[in-house]
Amino acid sequence: MDESGRQRPASHVAADISPQGAHRRSFKAWLASYIHSLSRRASGRPSGPSPRDGAVSGARPGSRRRSSFRERLRAGLSRWRVSRSSRRRSSPEAPGPAAKLRRPPLRRSETAMTSPPSPPSHILSLARIHKLCIPVFAVNPALRYTTLEIPGARSFGGSGGYGEVQLIREHKLAVKTIREKEWFAVELVATLLVGECALRGGRTHDIRGFITPLGFSLQQRQIVFPAYDMDLGKYIGQLASLRATTPSVATALHHCFTDLARAVVFLNTRCGISHLDIKCANVLVMLRSDAVSLRPAVLADFSLVTLNSNSTISRGQFCLQEPDLESPRGFGMPAALTTANFHTLVGHGYNQPPELSVKYLNNERAEFNNRPLKHDVGLAVDLYALGQTLLELLVSVYVAPSLGVPVTRVPGYQYFNNQLSPDFAVALLAYRCVLHPALFVNSAETNTHGLAYDVPEGIRRHLRNPKIRRAFTEQCINYQRTHKAVLSSVSLPPELRPLLVLVSRLCHANPAARHSLS
């Protein structure tokens, strides 16, 4: 009769005994029992002498000398050890089905990414509300992987202050690896937040201006994104070399940057998140079939993302369910995402609005240090930076070729130790007072909140230090001598007017005019 498939019921008596078939008995229990038996012997109760006791005590056969308590204890301990070892040798088989592990295995199951992942339907979901004001978000467990084992050649995609990017062109994937563990936690949370906002914005407002993650690895400190053709900086160089300035290119550019402006307003206002690092390298583009016109672009690189005053999740927490763990792993909102940092806001100064440069020169930083970022400040910074990226394209592709002179958007890349210097801030403000009036549109649609461009008198009036005011005045005079005559001869095709109007509104000297885009 075959009984290989049978099992004992849980109530069987064998479930209460050891796998060796005998009742488990600890040494402590045995010692207590043995001492109790010795006390009974000492009380005068008859007990026959043991040959083993005599052998251990060293007494001669037939001797009536009574062994000491220590000798009897040693003999009993020896018998207990012998009996225990004999039971182990007689039952070498493994524990049966009744024996179960009381803890999870030490080695967790591996989840390697072996094929290109599909875009997620969601990234975060509200799990519960803790203490009435702390939302706890569950991270989509399908995004997590341990190792990246997708076949295909890797190529260098770029590097920055926090990590580098590798491209897998065969599968249209980009893998970003963060160097530092602390910065990986910050960027991962920021990427998950912006990614969820991007998915919700696409469903409810048809806003698709942000890159969404496809997966992440805590062990490798990696985040996987869809790969794009190139960034905006490379596209500007390619467009300038091809000299492909057809009306269709200008129309596609206008649609692209209008959508990006809507996305920036949505992120800052509805989501309470400010990007704070919009530049050509962080705008990723896809080309149409003609290889020159743009498809809708996206913003990437959320290393400097900060929650602004419109955010309701600054105290939020996150939980991630991992394999073989009963309870999910929890982690809170990184402090770097919840407070403003003046150094982060100013950066190198290339794309920052004039009001920030003036505050930098006046040393007015108290309102930004260790305080929540104001929504209107974050929105004004992001919109101005987006306008500067568009202005970079217009100057490099249209203005400089039409003049035959290498005119640039900024006076030069002058900074020390990756920080903005006062000399460069003064030069940048003065240079914009000459460049912007030559390119910005001066009309009713751009002058609702005053002139769209900065004038020297307005900047000079806000500078407190007399020495800095004199330096600014001298720089304005110098740039007017070297650039004003050249820029006065700029002649751009009429199809660029919508782009120039958009630049004038995005880079308006009055922050309130930028807010009106929302």
UniProtKB/Swiss-Prot annotation:
Catalytic activity: L-seryl-[protein] + ATP = O-phospho-L-seryl-[protein] + ADP + H(+); L-threonyl-[protein] + ATP = O-phospho-L-threonyl-[protein] + ADP + H(+)
Gene Ontology molecular function: ATP binding; protein serine kinase activity; protein serine/threonine kinase activity
Nucleotide-binding found in the keyword field: yes
Keyword hit for Transferase: yes
Catalytic residue list: 277
Location in or out of the cell: Virion tegument; Host nucleus
Residues the entry annotates as binding ATP: 157-165, 176
SUPFAM superfamilies: Protein kinase-like (PK-like)
PROSITE patterns, per database record: PROTEIN_KINASE_DOM, PROTEIN_KINASE_ST
Alphabetically ordered keywords of this record: ATP-binding, Host nucleus, Host-virus interaction, Kinase, Nucleotide-binding, Serine/threonine-protein kinase, Transferase, Virion, Virion tegument
Spans annotated as Disordered: 1-22, 39-120
Biased composition (Low complexity): 44-61
InterPro entries xref list: Kinase-like_dom_sf, Prot_kinase_dom, Ser/Thr_kinase_AS
Residue ranges of domain Protein kinase in the record: 151-518
Any one of the GO CC terms: host cell nucleus
EC number(s) per entry: 2.7.11.1
Coiled-coil region list: none
Post-translational modification: Autophosphorylated.
UniProt family annotation: Belongs to the protein kinase superfamily. Ser/Thr protein kinase family.
Purpose of the protein: Multifunctional serine/threonine kinase that plays a role in several processes including egress of virus particles from the nucleus, modulation of the actin cytoskeleton and regulation of viral and cellular gene expression. Regulates the nuclear localization of viral envelopment factors UL34 and UL31, by phosphorylating the US3 kinase, indicating a role in nuclear egress. Disrupts host nuclear lamins, including LMNA and LMNB1. Phosphorylates the viral Fc receptor composed of glycoproteins E (gE) and I (gI).
Protein name: Serine/threonine-protein kinase UL13
Lineage start: Viruses, Duplodnaviria, Heunggongvirae, Peploviricota, Herviviricetes
